[in-house]
Amino acid sequence: MILFWTSGLSIYLFLYIFKDKNADLRFIIFGSLFPVIFDSILYFFGLTNQNEYIGHSIFFTVSLFFIFMIATKRGSLFRANSLLFSIGSFFYLVLSFTWLNQSIILYPLFQNSEDIFSLAKNYKTVLGGAGILYLFFKFRNIQILKEFINTGKFIY
């Protein structure tokens, strides 16, 4: 029954929030079913022992969104439909109350434990690496670094 709840309400929320009557709502439905389908396939093939796993993670959904944004051509129908798919996946995570279970919604940051806010041991390394990568790309050369040190602004 939760699948009907998430699919139906995903369509309603999309139309209410975005007011796009021309969107292909099948991609919203498929996106709202994708986390369940993906995790069921992983469970069926024995890749996990949980029926709610990586497909229910916000990082997985955000990663899909970024991949669609980077890999598709702006203004194309494929991109529009891919974004609808991503929106449907986001709606599923909200409407299925996945956000109530931190070990699932924030996988792999949080591990299964009794402590409500027990972070995985390597989160500082991952976050630090992300920060280093960002700064590396922002400070492409010494001139940009000097300008930032002097003014606090980036040269684009």
What would you call each of these model-derived segments?
Residues 1-156:
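N-terminal membrane-targeting hydrophobic helices
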